[in-house]
Amino acid sequence: MPIFTAQELAERFNLQLFGDGNLRIHGVATLTQASPEQLSFLANPRYLTQLLNSRAGVIVLHADDVKTASGTVLIAKDPYVTFAKIAALFDIKPAREAGIHPLATVDPSAHVSPTAHVGAFVSIGARSSIGASCIIGTGSIIGDDCTIDDGSELIARVTLISKVRLGKRVRIHPGAVLGGEGFGLAMENGHWIKIPQLGGVVIGDDCEIGANSCIDRGALDDTVLEEDVHIDNLVQIAHNCRIGAHTAIAGCTGIAGSAKIGRYCLLGGHVGVVGHLQICDNVVITGKSVVRNSIHTPGEYSSGTPLTDNRTWRKNAVRFKQLDMLVRRMMAVSKEKA
């Protein structure tokens, strides 16, 4: 585990230091759990009480909070971002040796960079390409005509079915499936006819896709995630969707076919997005909301039902069914008074 002094961290990240610059930091932790040899941070005033009682050796905080802390502190414009960068220094991953495991299967027409790591029980299909310094984890399946650019990682048991193109430094977690058939059906004489899904999936540079998430390939055009998109676990992105750069989508969200999500959007957990609509840039959708119409103005939107005690909720549920009747009565009374 690496060790850094407070002074070294201040110089590396251009931070203002108050206190003992020779203090040695062995790791990071929360305010409540940090030891005198660890660094923590304060980014939210609601945790001010934890700051006052913290044993952390070094604390990263905003200049406005410096008077509330004792001991060694590092002043940051954005303490949360700075903490993330410092924590990355302690996130040491074991090196993977370059080469193809003897239990992996690689089609003769596929290309694997000599600097890539291909783990056990991996299958790589025809005409697929694995770039430099890629990591293809145990049990991953890469179908035909897939391209994985330099520095990307499939952690384990990731499936790229076909026509999937990953950019540079893409990271995909276990159980994710990319390039599956989109849900395209047409009704004829009382029976469903499957619509061929002839497109692919394109993932931009620096994207991350969580465990057990699915991104379907397009029917004709590709399904696209632009650069630096972050997808949580258990997210469904249907065929022909386009997700704008720097957007983040939380777990259990479902996005129906051909929806277009803008850049720098945030979708909370369990959001539903109806197909064939557009959401502009810089939109926040709070958890459990359902987006039924296009959004053309940046801002925060909600449609989820707020939590109340069960007794109140049951009463309101009954009243909700009576809303139409009550409105009609009010309109009738209003007409009589007029």
UniProtKB/Swiss-Prot annotation:
InterPro entries registered for this protein in UniProt: Hexapep, LpxD, Trimer_LpxA-like_sf, UDP_GlcNAc_AcTrfase_non-rep
Catalytic reaction list: a UDP-3-O-[(3R)-3-hydroxyacyl]-alpha-D-glucosamine + a (3R)-hydroxyacyl-[ACP] = a UDP-2-N,3-O-bis[(3R)-3-hydroxyacyl]-alpha-D-glucosamine + holo-[ACP] + H(+)
Pathway: Bacterial outer membrane biogenesis; LPS lipid A biosynthesis
GO BP term, pick one: lipid A biosynthetic process
Keywords from the named record: Acyltransferase, Lipid A biosynthesis, Lipid biosynthesis, Lipid metabolism, Repeat, Transferase
Enzyme class: transferase
Annotated active site: 239
Top-level division of the source organism's lineage: Bacteria
Entry GO CC: membrane
A Pfam family of this chain: Hexapep
Annotated EC: 2.3.1.191
Role of this protein: Catalyzes the N-acylation of UDP-3-O-acylglucosamine using 3-hydroxyacyl-ACP as the acyl donor. Is involved in the biosynthesis of lipid A, a phosphorylated glycolipid that anchors the lipopolysaccharide to the outer membrane of the cell.
Subunit structure, interactors included: Homotrimer.
NCBIfam families named among the record's database cross-references: lipid_A_lpxD (TIGR01853), PRK00892.1 (NF002060)
Record's protein name: UDP-3-O-acylglucosamine N-acyltransferase
Lineage: Bacteria, Pseudomonadati, Pseudomonadota, Gammaproteobacteria, Lysobacterales
